[in-house]
C-alpha cells in the first residue's frame, strides 16, 4: 500500500456512471456502475452496492476494487 492509500485508510475513489436499481430486502441499497479513478484498476468499470443516497456523477470511496456485486435479479 502506498503512503497516500494509508493516509486515506486504503480507500480508492470511483465515479458513479449509472444507477442500475435498488437492491436489498427492503430496497435500502442502490446498485451502481462506477469507474475506478486511481490505482491498479484505474479506468475499470465495476458494479457495486451502495447504501445511502447516490446519483450519477457522485464520487464514492471504495475500500476494495477487485470485488464486484452480483447483478440484480440474477437467477
Curated annotation (Swiss-Prot):
CDD domains: S1_S28E
Keyword tRNA-binding: no
GO molecular function: structural constituent of ribosome
Entry GO terms, CC: cytosolic small ribosomal subunit
Ribonucleoprotein recorded as keyword: yes
Cited Gene3D superfamilies: Nucleic acid-binding proteins (2.40.50.140)
InterPro entries noted in UniProt: NA-bd_OB-fold (IPR012340), Ribosomal_eS28 (IPR000289)
Keywords for the protein's UniProt record, in alphabetical order: Ribonucleoprotein, Ribosomal protein
Top-level taxon: Archaea
GO terms, biological process: maturation of SSU-rRNA; ribosomal small subunit assembly; translation
SUPFAM superfamilies: Nucleic acid-binding proteins
Family membership: Belongs to the eukaryotic ribosomal protein eS28 family.
NCBIfam families, per the entry: PRK04007.1
Protein name as it appears in the record: Small ribosomal subunit protein eS28
